[in-house]
Every structure is written in C-alpha cells, then in structure tokens.
Regions:
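Helix-loop-helix hairpin linking two adjacent transmembrane segments in secondary transporters
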Residues: 144-197
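Extracytoplasmic gate region of multi-pass secondary transporters
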Residues: 33-38, 232-294, 348, 381
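Hydrophobic core of transmembrane alpha-helices in multi-pass small-molecule transporters
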Residues: 24, 92, 104-120, 248-249, ...
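Helix-to-loop junctions at the C-terminal end of transmembrane segments
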Residues: 65-78, 291-303, 389-390
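Extracytoplasmic
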Residues: 14-51, 65-69, 156, 256-263
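Interfacial helix-cap and linker-helix signal at transmembrane-aqueous boundaries
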Residues: 40-41, 72-73, 154-166, 266-267, ...
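C-terminal ends and interior cores of transmembrane alpha-helices
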Residues: 87-100, 313-326
Length: 398
C-alpha cells in the first residue's frame, strides 16, 4: 500500500506480514491434536481423556501466558519473545516423536507448546496493530487473527495425511520444521516500534501524532508485575468481566470443542479422518474471510453489535451439529462448516477494539487477560468433551 513517502510500501505492512507468517507457523500445532489423537490412541492405547488433558494444559497455558507475554514484549522486545516462542513450539513438536509414556505428552504437547504458542498468541497481533497502525487497526487485527486460521488451512490436510500414510511422527516433525523456518524471518524483519525504522505508524498525521512513551526496560519480574497490575486494574470494571465471560464461551465453542474433538467425533460416525480434517480446513478458509471482514466492520460499526450477532449465529450452529454428523458429507454439513467458519474467530477484532477503547494504554495487557479467559473456556471444553466421550461413549452431550 502507498505510504506517506509515496508509492513505497510502509514498513508497518512488512512487519504485519512477518507477524502473519509467525502466527501461521505457530498455528501448525493448532491443527495437530484432532488429527493425531486417533493414531496416538491406536499406538499407545491412551484414552481420549488423557490426550484431552494434554491439550487442555496447552490451551490453559496458551491463554495464561498471553498477558505476561505482552508485558515481556514491552520489556525485552517483540522480536526476542517471538523467536524464543517459535523455538519452544519446535522443541515441543519435534520432541514428541520420542514419546513412550502419556506423561511425556503432557510435557511436549502441554507445557512446551503451550508456553510457546501462548507467548505469541493474539496479544502479539494486538501489539503489532496498536503500535504500528493508527488507521486500519481493525483490519490489521482481523488479518493477523486470520494467520492462525490460515495455518490451520495449510497444515491440517498434510498433518492428517502424513499421520495416516507415514505415521504421526512425521506429522509432528512437519509442525516443528515450520516453526523453525519462521525464526530467521522474524529476526530479520521484526522491530518493536515504527521509530526503529525511522517512520510514524501507518496513517499517523505528522502534525498531530504524539508517540506514546515506551515502557522502561527491566527484568522478567517487573514485566510479570505489570501484567498482574493490568489484571487488578481491569477486574474493577464490569466491562472486563462481560468481555472475559463472552470470550470464554468463544474459546469453549471453537478451540476447545470443535478444534479438538470434531475429527474424533466425525470418526465415531464413520467419517474418514482425512475427510473430517478437510472439513476443518474449509472452516479455516471461511475463517480467513470472516475474520478479515470482521476487522473491516470493526472499523465502521459498534463492536458490541457485531459480538451479539456472532455469538447468536454460533449458538444456533452448535444446537444442530449433532444431527449433521454422518459417515458422508451432506449439504447441511457444508452449510454448517461455511457459517461456523465465517464466525470462528470473528469475535477477536471487536473484542480487541473494545479493550483498547475501554482500557486505553492498558488495553493490550487487558486483552491478554480476556484472551486467557478464552483459553480457560477452551481447556474446560476440551477436557470435558473428552471425559464425556470416555464415560458415555458418545460426543452428543458434549
């Protein structure tokens, strides 16, 4: 896009593009659990609830690390935090090929990948959008949020195919390789602030723009204290609790329930794993469209109205899903996949915008805590659905 300097691309867009690549690479694991649970269960005899526990630990850390990661990015730099995070994802995914016991699954899938993905979750996207853009913030937030969906779209079919043809270990190595490839790209291009590139944020008016003060560099302890202070500050506002509860429901109904258990549930109904993985990939396609469109709408419409609409559509979709699962894909399932895909994380841009609008300079860290609620909801749904499946023999009541 043209910038204030003529027809050259503003550096903000290059930074956003690299952030998209990093989020895409980290999203490789988001595609993995649903596709790998069946082969892991067949090889090791692990129950669905045990594997769901590992995913739940991952999802909890993915959320709880986020507000601290936002503070760490302020203290130590975005590039440093993201490079370490991608390395942890690679170690967790690559190390999992050596597993022989279920407790090791908790370490690799749960601890390492949970910390890695949590350190560059949606607070990373919010940090880039808020620091590098004055105009188009909502659109950029939508585009970066879509990075995870694009990762799911790209990784899910090959992960499922590799797990079925070459074995789950090769699928895990694919995820590890993708994370490692992104590290040098992030290190070469990513910078903390527009002033590091000698420019203003995209869309800033040179006559009126005043750069916000940079947080003082400090220790990890001071960064953690800043994250806790953000929670204490936000918890005194009813708006925070409304956003957190709504986002917890969002996490439960996406990452926790559908993201983890859709493929095993479809497999229970006789559908091939690769077919179910293909359907989730289609969710990823429409998620990209829905999230980018949601970002554009967030710049133009009251975010509160958007959230009411998004949650309403999602509730209707979940009510009808148990009657749509079968051994083949019917037109009604395609309709569900399209609608659910458009709605998947369309909630993120308006939620981030409301955090920025209500909490000002603390908005990014507060959004980190709201996102933590999202992942707590996801973890509860992932574990709960696994327990229901093991206890009742069906996902219907999940």
């Amino acid at each position: 896009m043209p910038s204030e300097r003529g027809f050259r691309v503003h550096p903000a867009w290059w930074v956003a593009a690299v952030a998209f690549v990093a989020l895409l690479a980290a999203a490789g694991f988001r595609a993995a659990p649903g596709a790998l649970m069946v082969p892991l269960g067949e090889e090791f005899g692990w129950s669905t609830s045990v594997m769901s526990l590992a995913v739940s630990i991952n999802l909890v850390l993915y959320g709880l690390i986020a507000p601290f990661a936002a503070a760490l990015m302020d203290r130590f730099g975005v590039r440093q935090v993201v490079a370490v995070a991608l390395t942890l994802v690679a170690l967790g995914a690559g190390g999992s090929v050596l597993m022989t016991a279920s407790w090791q699954l908790l370490i690799f899938w749960g601890l390492l990948i949970g910390i890695g993905t949590g350190s560059m979750a949606l607070v990373f996207a919010a940090t880039i959008a808020n620091r590098w853009f004055v105009k188009r913030r909502g659109l950029v937030m939508g585009m970066l949020t879509a990075g995870s969906a694009t990762g799911q779209l790209i990784f899910l079919p090959p992960v499922a195919a590799l797990a079925e043809t070459a074995g789950w270990r090769w699928a895990s190595l694919l995820v590890a390789a993708a994370a490692l490839v992104a590290v040098p790209i992030v290190w070469a291009v990513m910078r903390d602030y527009p002033s590091d590139r000698g420019v203003l944020p995209f869309g800033a008016d040179p006559a009126t723009y005043v750069a916000p003060p940079r947080p003082a560099k400090g220790s990890a302890l001071s960064a953690a204290r800043r994250a806790i202070d953000g929670l204490v500050f936000a918890s005194k506002h009813r708006s925070f609790w409304a956003l957190a509860i709504a986002f917890a429901i969002c996490g439960a109904t996406t990452n926790g329930l559908i993201g983890v258990h859709f493929i095993p549930s479809a497999h229970d109904h006789g559908m091939a794993t690769t077919v179910a993985a293909g359907l989730l990939a289609v969710v990823g396609v429409f998620d990209i469209l829905g999230t980018v469109a949601s970002g554009w709408l967030t710049d133009k419409i009251d975010p509160r109205f958007l959230l009411v609409a998004y949650y309403g559509f999602r509730g209707v979709g979940l009510l009808v899903l148990p009657w749509l699962l079968a051994d083949t894909v019917h037109p009604s399932m395609i309709i569900f996949i399209v609608v659910y895909g458009l709605d998947w994380v369309a909630t993120v841009p308006p939620t981030s915008a409301l955090c920025r609008e209500i909490f000002g300079e603390q908005g990014t860290i507060v959004f980190g805590w709201v996102f933590a609620a999202h992942q707590l909801g996801a973890a509860a749904a992932a574990l709960g659905a696994g327990l229901i499946r093991d206890t009742l023999g069906t996902y219907t009541y999940a």
